[in-house]
C-alpha cells in the first residue's frame, strides 16, 4: 500500500524528535512537486487538501495521481483531509481510499466539538484511518472560513487533556499564536503553553499556519512536541510569484509545459526548506 494512514508516521516522528511536513496541494503540478521532492530527500510526506481542493481537482483524480506518483517514487504517503467539517463528507472520502483526516470543529463550543470529533473517530478507526482535531482557533483564511484575529483562541492545556481523552483522536492541532496567512509582523508564539500541553497530552501535536514562521520557531515547536507542520500559503505564493515573473519576462508565452516549470521550481525550494527545518530528511 502506498496511500497510508499518518498515525504511524507521526508516532515515529514523535519518538525520534522530528516533524512530518503536510503540504497543501491544489493541482497536478503542486502534487508532483511535493511527491518528487520528498522522494529525492527520502522524507515522509503528508499531502493535504481542503474541501475546496478536492472539489476543484476531483477526489478520484487526487487519489489516483498521488497513488501513481507514490508507486513511481517508491514513497508511501498519506493523503490528508485538511480542515474538513462534515462527517458525511469524511465518510465518503474514507470509503474512496483516504486514510488520514482532520475534523475541524474548533468553531463550535467545547461539548459540540467533542461530540463531532468523537463521531468521526468512531467511524474512521474502523477503517484504520487516523484522525486529527483542533482545539482553539487560528486566525486567517482557510478555504471560505475567515477567522478574525480577535476571534482566535489559544488552546487551553487542561481542556486539551480532556479533549484527547474523550475523543480518542490520534493527533491534536494546537493554537499557540500561528495563523492561516503570511505574517505582516513576526508572530509571538506561546511556547510555554505548548510545553504545558505536551506535558498533559501524549499524542503527536500539530502546528498549523507555519508559512512564514522563523525557522527557529518551527524547530523550537518541534522540540516541544510538534510532530506535524502544515504549510500552505508559502507554497502558493512561491508558485504564483514565479508564474507572474515568467509572464513579465515572456508576455507572449502560452505553453503550460514551459511556464509551469519555474513555478514548480520555486515551490520545490520551499518544500526542500521545510523538509530540512522539520528534520525529516532521510527518515523513510
From Swiss-Prot:
Cofactor annotation: Zn(2+)
Alphabetical UniProt keywords: Galactitol metabolism, Lyase, Metal-binding, Zinc
One term under GO cellular component: cytosol
Matches recorded under Pfam families: F_bP_aldolase
EC number from the UniProt entry: 4.1.2.40
Gene3D superfamilies: Aldolase class I
Free-text cofactor note: Binds 1 zinc ion per subunit.
Lineage: superkingdom: Bacteria
Residues at which dihydroxyacetone phosphate binds: 181, 209-211, 230-233
Residues forming the catalytic site: 82 (proton donor)
Reactions accelerated catalytically: D-tagatofuranose 1,6-bisphosphate = D-glyceraldehyde 3-phosphate + dihydroxyacetone phosphate
Biological pathway: Carbohydrate metabolism; D-tagatose 6-phosphate degradation; D-glyceraldehyde 3-phosphate and glycerone phosphate from D-tagatose 6-phosphate: step 2/2
GO biological process: D-tagatose 6-phosphate catabolic process; galactitol catabolic process
Matches recorded under InterPro entries: Aldolase_TIM, Class_II_FBP_aldolase, FBA_II, TagBP_ald_KbaY/GatY, TagBP_aldolase_GatY
Subunit description: Forms a complex with GatZ.
Family per record: Belongs to the class II fructose-bisphosphate aldolase family. TagBP aldolase GatY subfamily.
Function: Catalytic subunit of the tagatose-1,6-bisphosphate aldolase GatYZ, which catalyzes the reversible aldol condensation of dihydroxyacetone phosphate (DHAP or glycerone-phosphate) with glyceraldehyde 3-phosphate (G3P) to produce tagatose 1,6-bisphosphate (TBP). Requires GatZ subunit for full activity and stability. Is involved in the catabolism of galactitol.
PANTHER family for this protein: D-TAGATOSE-1,6-BISPHOSPHATE ALDOLASE, D-TAGATOSE-1,6-BISPHOSPHATE ALDOLASE SUBUNIT GATY-RELATED
Name used for this protein in its record: D-tagatose-1,6-bisphosphate aldolase subunit GatY
Protein's organism: Salmonella paratyphi A (strain AKU_12601)
Amino acid at each position: 500500500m502506498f496511500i497510508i494512514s499518518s498515525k504511524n508516521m507521526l508516532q515515529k516522528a514523535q519518538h525520534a524528535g522530528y516533524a512530518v511536513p503536510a503540504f497543501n496541494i491544489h493541482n497536478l503540478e503542486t502534487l508532483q512537486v511535493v511527491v518528487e521532492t520528498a522522494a529525492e530527500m527520502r522524507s515522509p510526506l503528508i499531502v493535504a487538501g481542503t474541501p475546496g481542493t478536492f472539489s476543484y481537482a476531483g477526489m478520484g483524480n487526487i487519489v489516483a495521481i498521488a497513488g501513481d506518483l507514490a508507486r513511481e517514487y517508491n514513497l508511501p504517503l498519506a493523503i490528508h483531509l485538511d480542515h474538513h467539517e462534515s462527517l458525511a463528507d469524511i465518510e465518503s472520502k474514507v470509503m474512496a481510499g483516504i486514510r488520514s483526516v482532520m475534523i475541524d470543529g474548533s468553531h463550535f463550543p467545547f461539548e459540540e466539538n467533542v461530540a463531532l470529533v468523537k463521531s468521526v473517530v468512531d467511524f474512521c478507526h474502523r477503517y484504520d484511518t487516523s484522525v486529527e482535531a483542533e482545539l482553539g482557533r487560528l486566525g486567517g483564511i482557510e478555504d471560505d472560513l475567515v477567522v478574525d484575529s480577535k476571534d482566535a483562541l489559544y488552546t487551553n492545556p487542561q481542556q486539551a487533556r480532556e479533549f484527547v481523552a474523550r475523543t480518542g483522536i490520534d493527533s491534536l492541532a494546537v493554537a499557540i499564536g500561528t495563523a492561516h496567512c503570511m505574517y505582516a509582523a513576526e508572530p509571538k508564539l506561546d511556547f510555554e503553553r505548548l510545553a504545558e500541553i505536551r506535558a498533559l497530552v501524549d499524542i503527536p501535536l500539530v502546528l498549523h499556519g507555519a508559512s512564514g514562521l522563523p525557522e527557529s520557531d518551527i524547530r523550537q515547536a518541534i522540540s516541544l512536541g510538534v510532530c506535524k507542520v502544515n504549510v500552505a500559503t508559502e507554497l502558493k505564493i512561491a508558485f504564483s510569484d514565479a508564474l507572474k515573473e515568467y509572464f513579465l519576462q515572456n508576455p507572449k508565452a502560452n505553453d503550460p509545459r514551459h511556464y509551469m516549470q519555474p513555478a514548480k521550481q520555486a515551490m520545490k525550494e520551499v518544500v526542500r526548506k521545510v523538509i530540512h527545518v522539520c528534520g525529516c530528511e532521510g527518515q523513510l
